[in-house]
Amino acid sequence: MKKWSLGFAVLLVSASVMAKDIQLLNVSYDPTRELYEQYNKAFSAHWKQQTGDDVAIRQSHGGSGKQATSVINGIDADVVTLALAYDVDAIAERGRIDKAWIKRLPDNSAPYTSTIVF
């Protein structure tokens, strides 16, 4: 019995230190497709270096409002990067994310902004 218990304990410890394969889904708006293709590759390499875990990021792109509706209707997004705070607010109003999402990260949870030039 002791050998079995010791073997099981070693197996549990070994499993906990093995690298993990992580799958994430980023639900985003159309113009960010190429940006996130590049960013995801860089992030995956960084994550692997820091943790030893492999992370694969799938992307879903469409109009910002349509993507918000997809999340509201149940698409299992791990990350939401939409064009308008209004769209993210709609997700929060339906209880899919915390209503205080904008205060969660620096810069009102907006890692970048864009400027329109005429």
Question: Where do the PLM segments sit?
Answer:
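N-terminal segment of the mature folded domain
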Residues: 20-118
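Short, linear, compositionally biased motifs with a strong N-terminal bias
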Residues: 10-11, 86
